[in-house]
Amino acid sequence: MAQSKFLREYKLVVVGGGGVGKSCLTIQLIQSHFVDEYDPTIEDSYRKQCVIDDEVALLDVLDTAGQEEYSAMREQYMRTGEGFLLVYSITSRQSFEEITTFQQQILRVKDKDYFPMVVVGNKCDLEGEREVTRQEGEALARSFNCKFIETSAKSRINVDKAFYDIVREIRRYNREMQGYSTGSGGSNAGGPSNKMEVNDSDAEAGCCSKCVLM
C-alpha cells in the first residue's frame, strides 16, 4: 500500500517505578539489544522512524526516572506527552501498585477523564518470580479503559507491539477528539467514549509494522 509522505511525530513517554525495565524496553525498541547493567535514568530521549499500519511515524520516546526523588520532573513531561506506557514489573507488586498513581497524575495534569495509555507488565520471562498475575494486570488496564500487554525486554517479547499499540491509540484518540469537537459541542474533558479494546490478542504484535533507526 502507498505510504503517507507526511512524517507524523508521536511523543511517547515511558513511566513507572524504579527498576521495572523502562530503559531496557526503550533501548530494545530503538537499538534491538538488551542492556543488563546501566545507571538509573534521569531522563533520556530516543527517536526512531517506523511504518505502523502503512502510516509513517516518527517515535519520540522519553524514558523517565522512576526514583521518587525525581518526581518533581513528572508534571513537565506529562504535559507534553501524547501517549504513555505505564510500566511495572510482574516480579514486583509494589511497582504494580504504583501504576495507579502515575495514571491519576497524568489525567490530573492533562485535565482529562481519559488519555492514551497502555499498561505494560514487563519481565514476563521471569515467570518463576512472578508476584502479579496477568489477570490482575488485565483488570487494572480495564479499570483505566486502556490496553494491557505483558513484555520482556530481555527476550524481546511484545516490545514493538507495546509501542505500536500506544501509537495506534493516539491515532484513534485524535480521530475521535476531532469528531467530538465538531460534533455535539460538549466538553473535551471526557474524551472519546469508545476506549481501546483491552483483550486484543497478542498475536497481532508485528502486523503491518516496521521500524528504522533515525
From Swiss-Prot:
Residues 212-214 form a propeptide. The keyword Transmembrane helix does not apply. GO terms for molecular function: GTP binding; GTPase activity. GO terms for biological process: signal transduction. It is a lipid-anchor. GO terms for cellular component: plasma membrane. The modification Cysteine methyl ester is found at residue 211. A lipid is attached at residue 211 (S-farnesyl cysteine). InterPro entries: P-loop_NTPase, Small_GTP-bd, Small_GTPase, Small_GTPase_Ras-type. It holds the Pfam family Ras. SUPFAM superfamilies: P-loop containing nucleoside triphosphate hydrolases. Residues 178-197 are annotated as: Disordered. It is found in: Cell membrane. PROSITE patterns: RAS. Its main location: membrane. GTP binds at residues 19-24, 35-41, 65-66, 122-125, 152-154. The keyword 4Fe-4S does not apply. A motif (Effector region) lies at residues 38-46. Keywords: Cell membrane, GTP-binding, Lipoprotein, Membrane, Methylation, Nucleotide-binding, Prenylation. Alternates between an inactive form bound to GDP and an active form bound to GTP. Activated by a guanine nucleotide-exchange factor (GEF) and inactivated by a GTPase-activating protein (GAP). Interacts with farnesyltransferase beta subunit RAM1. Modulates the activity of the adenylate cyclase catalytic subunit and therefore affects the biosynthesis of cyclic-AMP. Plays a role in both surface attachment and surface recognition of appressoria, a highly specialized infection structure for plant penetration. Regulates appressorium formation by coordinated regulation of cAMP signaling and Pmk1 MAPK pathways. NCBIfam families: small_GTP. This is Ras-like protein 2.
